[in-house]
Regions:
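Aromatic-rich peripheral "rim/lid" segments of glycoside hydrolase catalytic domains that contact
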Residues: 167-172, 177, 182, 318-389
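Aromatic-lined substrate-binding rim segments of carbohydrate-active enzymes
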Residues: 56-61, 70-146, 192-226, 285-286
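Acidic (Asp/Glu)-rich catalytic clusters
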Residues: 32-35, 56-63, 99-110, 162-163, ...
Length: 389
């Protein structure tokens, strides 16, 4: 997942739009209690899906309790299935994900599946970041996924052999839906007025995935919505319109987002000069980073009650190789430990997921891994292994 261009745009636009921010500053008094059951994990699809025989042993060595994996609807269902709620429908290809969950079980790691990416047949042959035309298609896919990874589904390997697939109980609805890289467009003009289309569509995406997962009849699954980008400009006329996370949460509620089991967020700092404890510099912040995550907790509580908060993506890049966005290797390890401590002190935070095991090779990508692209180990590897959980 490349965020270099995203962060440059968001930092620039947030400086312009700061005065028009929609966030309400507040720190929940509960944040000082310890989160004793917080799951700690890693998100690195190239390692877990691309080279899983290497990726999963590394996860085990890092003592990861959970791995986030993108379950791409478009790749599983390149063609419309005849019986969409049946995980054995021949239109579906789950092979990559079956392999991942089997290796996760072998290494005693839980899986968090994030459903995203609309198939061409479901949105008029447009980009994967365009919402489905009929949200029932997405709901049916979520049901099929939950059934396949219910813990009781047997994959038929041959006429005489079957494989019992492990259970997946944790699910995520989309990725950064307030960011046009993942859900577009964010705004649309309707009858002369701007509609926050991203939030409108996401309310339906979340409802569909929640209903599909819980409708499978497993009974112990949990579905998180949100997975929001920490920034947003709230400027529909801008070249790269996006919606700030608190505004997106409120708008999703207004447009009919009914329920979820947890709210997920990605509280990245905007610049390497800002530590995990730093708060947004603007008096009325549009962003939600780790230092002011209490603002998000308070708003979720106001709108939906005391739902858990999941940090499903976080990290600091290093220099080398990243001279602009990176911190030193030593500082990355220190910030990792600090960010974990901040999250763990907040009893509402139930999950903390670091982004990347290994750096992406292209500099336009992301370099927050515990290893460089060439395999050199950073001090953050040891820091992550030493996290107390």
């Amino acid at each position: 997942m490349s965020k270099r261009t995203i962060l440059i745009a968001l930092v620039t636009l947030s400086l312009v739009a700061g005065a028009s921010a929609l966030a309400t500053r507040a720190t929940a008094s509960r944040s000082h209690a310890t989160s004793r059951s917080m799951l700690v994990g890693i998100f690195d699809d190239p390692m877990t899906l691309g080279t899983p025989d290497k990726g999963f042993p590394l996860l085990k060595g890092l003592r990861a309790q959970i791995v986030r994996i993108t379950l791409t609807w478009r790749s599983v269902a390149p063609k419309r299935p005849k019986v969409a709620t049946d995980p054995a429908d021949p239109a579906y290809d789950w092979s990559v994900f079956d392999r991942a969950v089997l290796l996760a079980k072998k290494n005693k790691i839980q899986v968090l599946f994030g459903i995203q990416g609309t198939p061409a047949w479901a949105n008029g042959r447009r980009s994967a970041r365009i919402a489905p035309t009929n949200y029932r298609d997405l709901q049916n896919f979520a049901t099929a996924a939950a059934k396949r990874y219910s813990g009781s589904f047997k994959r038929k390997d041959s006429d005489t052999e079957e494989t019992l697939l492990p259970a997946v109980r944790l699910w995520l609805a989309w990725n950064e839906p307030n960011n046009p890289n993942f859900l577009a467009p964010q705004y649309k003009k309707v009858h002369g007025r701007w509609l926050a289309l991203g939030a409108y569509q996401y309310a339906r995406i979340c409802n569909a995935i929640y209903a599909g997962i819980h409708g499978a009849g497993v009974g112990t699954e949990r579905v998180a919505c949100g997975a929001t980008d920490p920034f947003g400009n709230n400027q529909p006329k801008s070249r790269r319109a996006s919606i700030s996370p608190l505004a997106f949460l409120r708008l999703s509620k207004r447009y009919g987002l009914r329920r979820f089991d947890a709210w997920a967020h990605h509280p990245y700092a905007p610049m390497p000069s800002e530590s995990p404890a730093a708060k947004p510099k603007k008096l009325k912040a549009t962003s939600v980073i780790l230092g002011n995550i209490g603002d998000l907790t308070k708003e979720v509580t106001r709108l939906y009650g005391g739902k858990p908060i999941w940090i499903t993506e976080y990290g600091y890049q290093t220099r080398p190789p990243d001279k602009f966005f990176g911190v030193s290797w030593k500082t990355q390890a220190k910030y990792l430990s600090q960010s974990y401590a901040i999250a763990r002190k907040n009893r509402r935070i139930g999950m903390f997921v670091w982004f990347l095991i290994r750096d992406e090779r292209a500099l336009r990508g992301w370099q927050s891994g515990f290893f460089t692209a060439s395999g050199a180990r950073k001090p953050s590897y040891t820091a992550f292994r030493r996290l107390k959980h």
